[in-house]
């Protein structure tokens, strides 16, 4: 596994533990209603704690479109 796959895997586990459903890297989280505002905050806080990054509130919806988009943001912040 390369570092990007590991990142997708770790973020995927965080998302799945909060939404209690299996998600793929490109599963549309917000558009499908899988993630609502409360779970978006939970995911954001968990990702920030796990990876030591900060996701500005106005950008949460943009970066929580999918596991892949969230992983890309986290990777860019490292």
Description of each model-found segment:
Residues 2-35, 43-45, 49-78:
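Phosphopantetheine-dependent thiolation modules in NRPS/PKS and related acyl-activating systems
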């Amino acid at each position: 596994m390369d570092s990007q796959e590991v990142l997708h895997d770790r973020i995927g586990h965080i998302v799945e533990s909060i939404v209690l459903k299996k998600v793929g890297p490109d599963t549309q989280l917000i558009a499908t209603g899988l993630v609502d505002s409360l779970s978006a905050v939970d995911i954001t806080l968990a990702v920030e704690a796990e990876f030591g990054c900060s996701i500005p509130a106005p950008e949460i919806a943009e970066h929580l479109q999918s596991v892949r988009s969230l992983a890309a943001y986290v990777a860019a912040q490292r």
